[in-house]
Structures are given as structure tokens and as C-alpha cells.
Amino acid sequence: MADVNQILRVYGKHLQKNVRLKALAEKAWSYEDAHKFADEAAGLLCDVLKMYMDPATVTYDDAVRIFEAAMQKNYSEVTKVCAKVQRDMYRKAGVGLNALTPEFNAEKARGIAQVITDAEEVTDDYMRNLVKNNALGVVDDMIRINSEASENVGLYVHIVRKYDDVGLHNGKDVCQWCMEREGEWDNYQEALAAGAFERHPGCGCVIDYHVGKTHTWSNTKGAWNDV
């Protein structure tokens, strides 16, 4: 039986010792940086899970215990970085709002446990796609709830989804499903309706957003235009 506490301890040590992740956590200034952090932190978690859990023999109940605890730890690390990004974003926009944090979704963790225990074979890539998808979903949820909240108080938002040729896309044909969701929106509801926050397992698309008091975002300047 896998020791959940041991998994969490080792994962925590891996996070502390990883120079690149520490730098990303400290210097992240955009949700794209948060995306990179979530992706790499999830990769570390997969390495630890591989050390202590055998997908071929783990029971559903044990898998639930492992994934709920591991995903919650990952969620905590990712939301800390996202909250920093959001606070900096509000500070630069000159508004005194607090960053909102989505609740931990234990149902997703249980869903991964179900998929793992039901699968006839679980490859390393398959596991990584599931775990990374969950981690990137936390970043997406941070963007979703904060962009909606910003818009609700009269601020202007600019949401971007960029296609990224990684994960299941790597070495394969262009993913039409993701291409249909790529774009830029100046309205949260339009981005939501366009599927900007949706992912499939292995999806590496990058979602970012900006907030400001003016109504037009300049990609060239990387700043809001004065009006």
C-alpha cells in the first residue's frame, strides 16, 4: 500500500529543491508563467507517484486517497503562484481587489483515480496527461473566476488562448478541437461561450488574461492603451 504521507513529503522536497520552479514561483508576473509552473510541478508529482504507486495494482480506494491528497498539495502550490500573479496584476492596474481562489475540486481527483484503476494499461504519458491536465485546470479556474469578478466590478479584461504543440499534439496532426478554441476576447462571457477554458487530457494550450481600467489591450505594447 502506498504511503500517502511519504508521497507528500517527497513531493514537497522535490518542489523545494527545484531551482527553476522556485524561480518561477518567485518571479511569475503573468498567468503564462503560472501555466509553466503548474505544468512542471505536475511533472514532478508524476515522478513521485511513479516511485510510490503502481497503477497496475493500486485499488480504487487507495488511488482515491493518493490522488486527493497529492492533487490538493499540487492545487495549493499552483494557486499560491496564481494568487501572486493576480495581486500583481491588480496592483499594476491600480485597483484594490483581492485575488479569488477556486475551491479544490476533489471530484476531479476521484475521477482520475477511477480512470487509473479502470484502465487496462497506464503508461507514463497517460498518467502525466491526466495529472498535468488537472494542474493546468487550476490555472484556468483562477483566470476564469478572477476575470469574471474583474468584469463584474467594471474593469476591462482581455482573455487569450494560444495553441501550443505539446502533450498529445506533439508529433501529430494539428488538433482541430484546440484550434477552434484559440482566440482573444474582451469579454468573459464570450470567452466562456467560445470554450476558452476547456481542455482535453494532454492539452498544452496556454490561457492568459489582462485586466485594466481602459478598454483596449495592445499586444504590441503588452499594456492597456490610454483612453
Annotate each predicted stretch with a short phrase.
Residues 1-200, 208-227:
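Domain-core detector
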